[in-house]
Amino acid sequence: MNKLLQCHQVSKIYREGEFETEVLKGVDFELEQGELVAIVGTSGSGKSTLLHILGALDDATHGEVAFLDYQLSALSGNKQAQVRNQHLGFIYQFHHLLADFTAVENVAMPLLIGGKSPKQAKLAAEALLEKVGLQHRMHHRPSELSGGERQRVAIARALVNKPALVLADEPTGNLDHKTALQIYDLMRELNRESGTAFLVVTHDNELAAKMDRILYMQDGVLASDNR
């Protein structure tokens, strides 16, 4: 398998006046193309901070992240935004759908931002919503959808640009257990079909066990890597 992402000695220090808090401490790991990986650990262990750095949403204080052919820290802000739009997908505990837009409009948005025509964007969004089982709900707004349906829309939006990697931060945290299992099964199915890699932060050990590999974070350190 080919290396998709390489994280080398990544540290993150937050400074406020003369006080420093080291949130990440020399994190090292690699992610292969098409892998399905969970990151687990207690609250405050650095999981979400690591995900933000891997997604070029924040900068490491020390260390390097290589993604595809890019050294993320060497890119301009505009180039980082382009990489996020074209090669990365994001899913969060809260769906972050735009309330005034329908499901299909929300899913089409990244394509429109990336320069696709409205017709191309709509067709691609409709195809993905059908794939996640929402063909009958695509013209509904988020307020008209259940929690599980909203998260399916968020997953479709994350995948619409056919990213190499999806970063998911507690994607089932607001869902009941049955719906959470359905969302994880959907992510695994889409992973098999598209070859998109998933890196998922979760507190749920049962759901993490469904992944190909589990990374354990503790006090800002990658404590173990179980394949």
Swiss-Prot record:
Its EC number is 7.6.2.-. One of its GO terms (molecular function) is ATP binding. SUPFAM superfamilies: P-loop containing nucleoside triphosphate hydrolases. GO terms for biological process: lipoprotein localization to membrane. One of its GO terms (cellular component) is plasma membrane. It comes from the Bacteria. Pfam families: ABC_tran. It is found in: Cell inner membrane. Part of the ABC transporter complex LolCDE involved in the translocation of mature outer membrane-directed lipoproteins, from the inner membrane to the periplasmic chaperone, LolA. Responsible for the formation of the LolA-lipoprotein complex in an ATP-dependent manner. The complex is composed of two ATP-binding proteins (LolD) and two transmembrane proteins (LolC and LolE). This is Lipoprotein-releasing system ATP-binding protein LolD. The lineage of its organism: Bacteria, Pseudomonadati, Pseudomonadota, Gammaproteobacteria, Vibrionales. The gene is lolD.
